[in-house]
């Protein structure tokens, strides 16, 4: 039977067999890399997505044979280093994903290579620091320390030293740390009656995320205000650690499991008690919806959490379809340039944020669906910063079109990178960077 390009069946994804000793076998890994790279070489649809594919194709084209057998196995790592696990090749481009018999899952092959590298070599101090978001946040928000950290991160001379000593790009804008983390300053929910809809549970558990908790708690407070405005009772889990996505991108799967063991039991209890679980950062949502179930396919608690997990705007749009969301918007937003992050696209729920913003009268939404180049910790590393800005340049240009009133992305770090890209080119922008949850709060006229 002839193997055809593409498939008439819906894409599926196999669990990651990361506990199998063969997963870490160098020869087995290199054989699978060679097989997949050969398929990618014959296709090349993903060349515009990230640096991994141009790096691979340059290695092949500049090799002695012009084929994958002309590429030294030692150079495979150069491809792996350029992959930041955005998942767009798998989700939007590749015609050979399962159930196609060629069974190509490029991101998870790169994850396997990162896991092997981590097992062999560990990680640098810089990478351990950047991916320890929860620990870093707890330390940086200590009252005596937080102002010193923020001042240091905004001082060019200090940033120059940080680049030389740690490898954190001096030119990359870093987020401020909050004096009052979200989880320590939560508005208590009113005990509204629970109104379940056909598509949505009527009560919400919020997973704060490291970034919103320690860096931009206002985003979390705005989410709570939106829930309160719509009389949806909410609460937080009793305990919370990092979702594990930064450690996943590092290949540190053992720490991913440790974090899972902290987060999943309380979240699973909430899921089984009928709560929808909302996370205001797409990478965290994707971690619970997709990556943890693929890493721990036999864990029923992980499955329960995945089934209860919603992107906030996915929840609000479905709540609206249930006839249980208010549309009493009083403030137009004007021109909004809205960016759809990679990890929001990877959830396959459609453009729910754009749909919700378009509910607001007097609002024009310019939607940009392309990688902004920040990609977790990857885009602040000195060796990748210039490449990350190059990847984001088309997004920066399109987001600046029509002189917007707001620049917005579901991913807060992508939003910051976009505004930096705009201002690096054209100087200070009149556009305000605001999260879509903040925009909806403004549109409701909520203070």
What are these regions (language model features)?
Residues 2-10, 47-52, 181-196:
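Conserved oxyanion/phosphate-binding beta-strand-loop segments in alpha/beta enzyme cores
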Residues 5-23, 48-84, 96-126, 428-439:
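Non-heme iron-sulfur electron-transfer modules
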Residues 24-38, 68-83, 228-230, 357-359:
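Short, intrinsically disordered, charge-biased short linear motifs at domain edges
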Residues 28-31, 71-74, 101, 251, ...:
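A structural signal for alpha-helical segments
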Residues 33-53, 75-104, 113, 137-143, ...:
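Cysteine-centered iron-sulfur cluster-binding motifs in ferredoxin-type domains/subunits
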């Amino acid at each position: 039977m002839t193997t055809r390009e593409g498939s008439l069946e819906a894409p599926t994804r196999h669990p990651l067999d990361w506990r199998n000793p063969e997963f870490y076998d160098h020869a087995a890994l290199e054989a699978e890399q060679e097989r997949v790279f050969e398929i990618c070489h014959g296709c090349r649809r993903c060349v515009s997505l990230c640096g991994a594919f141009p790096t691979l194709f340059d290695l092949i084209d500049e090799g002695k044979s012009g084929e994958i057998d002309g590429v030294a196995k030692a150079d495979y790592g150069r491809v792996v280093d350029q992959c930041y696990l955005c998942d767009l090749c798998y989700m939007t481009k590749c015609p050979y994903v399962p159930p196609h018999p060629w069974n190509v899952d490029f991101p998870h092959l790169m994850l396997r290579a990162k896991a092997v590298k981590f097992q062999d070599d560990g990680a640098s101090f810089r990478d351990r620091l950047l991916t320890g978001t929860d620990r870093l946040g707890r330390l940086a928000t200590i009252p005596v320390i937080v102002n010193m950290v923020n001042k240091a991160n905004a001082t060019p001379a200090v940033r120059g030293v940080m680049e030389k000593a740690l490898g954190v790009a001096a030119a990359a804008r870093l987020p401020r740390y909050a004096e009052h983390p979200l989880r320590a300053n939560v508005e208590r929910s009113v005990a509204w009656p629970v109104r379940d809809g056909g598509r949505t549970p009527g009560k919400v558990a919020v997973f704060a995320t490291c970034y919103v908790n320690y860096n931009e708690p206002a985003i979390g407070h705005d989410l709570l205000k939106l829930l309160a405005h719509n009389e949806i009772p909410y609460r937080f889990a009793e305990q919370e650690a990092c979702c594990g996505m930064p450690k996943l991108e590092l290949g540190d799967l053992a720490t991913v499991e440790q974090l899972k063991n902290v987060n999943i039991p309380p979240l699973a209890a909430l899921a089984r008690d009928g709560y929808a679980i909302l996370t205001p950062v797409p990478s965290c949502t994707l971690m619970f919806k997709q990556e943890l179930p693929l890493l721990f396919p036999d864990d029923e608690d992980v499955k329960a959490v995945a089934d209860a997990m919603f992107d906030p705007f996915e929840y609000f749009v479905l709540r609206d379809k249930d006839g249980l969301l208010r549309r009493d918007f009083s403030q137009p937003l004007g021109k909004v340039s809205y960016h759809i992050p990679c990890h929001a696209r990877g959830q396959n729920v459609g453009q729910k944020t754009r749909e919700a913003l378009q509910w607001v009268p007097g609002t024009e939404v310019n939607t940009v669906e392309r990688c902004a180049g920040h990609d977790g910790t990857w885009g602040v590393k000195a060796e990748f910063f210039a490449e990350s800005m190059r990847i984001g340049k088309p997004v920066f240009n399109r987001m600046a079109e029509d002189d917007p009133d707001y620049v917005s992305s579901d991913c807060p770090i992508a939003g910051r990178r976009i505004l930096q890209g705009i201002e690096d080119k054209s100087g200070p922008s009149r556009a305000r960077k605001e999260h879509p949850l903040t925009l909806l709060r403004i549109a409701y006229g909520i203070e």
